[in-house]
Amino acid sequence: MNTIDMLELEQMKKNIPPFKPGDTVKVHVKIVEGDKSRIQAFQGVVIARQNGGIRESFTVRKISNGIGVERVFPLHSPSLDAIEVITRGHVRRAKLYYLRKLRGKAARIREKKYVAAH
């Protein structure tokens, strides 16, 4: 491993839950306004994950007042406070950009079913 990889490995966050495109997540973001800071939640469906390592980012889409809103979050950013996985979705694509064209019930994602071990 070279020195750049070692430096990046030190700066990467360790407490990131595993999530994939199709999962519904709640992202807690630190917002600084002047001298005050607060945490704002952004809940939506993960439609893409890009790159890898310290440069990794993911895109979350939600519908707010009938308008689609997408935000791209750097995965290892210090402004991310926490990521919660709300539901696991079952999709057959890595990039869910087709959801941008769908409205209403057509934009639903099937929930992944788990079989309990005996």
Curated annotation (Swiss-Prot):
Give the UniProt family note: Belongs to the bacterial ribosomal protein bL19 family.
Q: Name one GO cellular component term.
A: cytosolic large ribosomal subunit
One Pfam entry for this protein is Ribosomal_L19
UniProt keyword Transit peptide present: no
Family matches, as Gene3D superfamilies: 2.30.30.790
Instruction: Indicate yes or no for the key word Cytoplasm.
Output: no
Write the protein's name: Large ribosomal subunit protein bL19
Domain of life, per UniProt, equals: Bacteria
Which terms does the UniProt entry file under GO BP?
Answer: translation
Where does this protein come from, organism-wise?
Geobacter metallireducens (strain ATCC 53774 / DSM 7210 / GS-15)
Which PROSITE patterns does the record associate with it? RIBOSOMAL_L19
A GO molecular function annotation here is: structural constituent of ribosome
Which NCBIfam families does the UniProt entry name for this protein? rplS_bact
